[in-house]
């Protein structure tokens, strides 16, 4: 699953005590979408701007680096090596992280820069800003041909993405709970309605709301009695309180010995078919989940390549046989 906004908030809450004040010693770019900041104290901060797995976390996984660092990596080294982390912020419940850094240039001048991670699926990006909020460079440049409304190019002032027209449990709690009490139309599926009206909530959590209210993940509003509607409102209230109090639990879901999802709270919707396991930290949870996923994808890719090679050899053999002269 993509890292949803509440889970991202949980990760950042965990990271702050370890990262605030830490010094950046090295910058690496093991893959096109990955930047690793090596921090004083043997910490490795991974910032992934890949379409399928955008995230920020501390990682214990050692990744091979290319012999020649990419240009973006060299630029980050120039600006960030020696910098100290001043703050780590998330705008409301957006899938974004803003690292504010105190940097010293080659002339000894001190300034603040920001490294912005946008965890937005195929639009994920990593952007370096100067002290005035101008873009120094992006992992992916976005010009007018790619977006008519929001360009990301060196020299332009950086602007946050336009927020979705949805309610936030963090900054609009009262309105959020009032809307939950009204609910949707009788034929509307509860989980779909939750996704349409609230920001920061993933499909997994929307289904969990529906399940805990109506005992089914695809329950519709018309099937809920008054008690169940009250239970749905309570889910919103409990989640809002957990977010405000930063009360989270790293949870990873396994099915057939394979990780299928992760989140920040207990999950009941799958029953016995899925094992719900907790971990000591969100970074450990993310390392475990994505490392297993990458191994599965590598194994599947190798299997496809082996099948393709066998198919190619078989076709070649058939071609050779067809070209053999027939006996008189």
Regions found by a protein language model. Give the residues of each.
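Extended, highly charged segments
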Residues: 1-317, 323, 327-328
């Amino acid at each position: 699953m993509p890292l949803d906004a509440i889970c991202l908030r949980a990760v950042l809450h965990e990271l702050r005590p370890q990262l605030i004040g830490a010094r950046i010693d090295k910058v690496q770019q093991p893959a096109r979408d990955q930047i690793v900041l090596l921090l004083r104290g043997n910490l490795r901060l991974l910032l992934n701007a890949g379409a399928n797995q955008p995230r920020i976390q501390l990682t214990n996984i050692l990744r091979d680096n290319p012999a020649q660092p990419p240009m973006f990596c060299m630029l980050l080294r120039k600006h960030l090596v020696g910098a100290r982390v001043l703050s780590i912020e998330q705008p409301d419940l957006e899938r974004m992280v803003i690292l504010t850094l105190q940097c010293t240039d080659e002339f000894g001048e001190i300034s603040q820069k920001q490294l912005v991670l946008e965890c937005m699926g195929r639009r994920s990006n990593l952007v370096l800003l100067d002290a005035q909020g101008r873009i120094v460079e992006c992992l992916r440049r976005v010009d007018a041909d790619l977006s008519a409304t929001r360009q990301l190019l060196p020299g332009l002032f950086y602007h946050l993405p336009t927020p979705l027209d949805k309610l936030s449990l963090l900054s609009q709690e009262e309105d959020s709970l009032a809307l939950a009490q009204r609910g949707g139309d009788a034929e509307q599926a509860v989980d779909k309605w939750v996704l349409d009206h609230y920001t920061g909530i993933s499909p997994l959590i929307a289904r969990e709301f529906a399940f805990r209210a109506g005992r089914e993940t695809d329950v519709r509003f018309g099937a809920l009695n008054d008690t169940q509607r009250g239970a749905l409102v309570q889910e919103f209230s409990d989640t809002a309180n957990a977010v405000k109090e930063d009360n989270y639990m790293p949870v990873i879901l396994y099915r057939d010995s394979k990780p299928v999802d992760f989140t920040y709270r207990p999950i009941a919707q799958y029953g016995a078919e899925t094992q719900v396991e907790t971990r000591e930290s969100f970074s450990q949870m993310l390392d475990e989940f994505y490392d297993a996923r990458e191994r599965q994808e590598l194994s599947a890719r190798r299997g496809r390549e082996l099948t393709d090679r066998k198919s190619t050899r078989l076709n070649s053999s058939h071609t050779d046989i067809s070209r053999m002269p027939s006996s008189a």
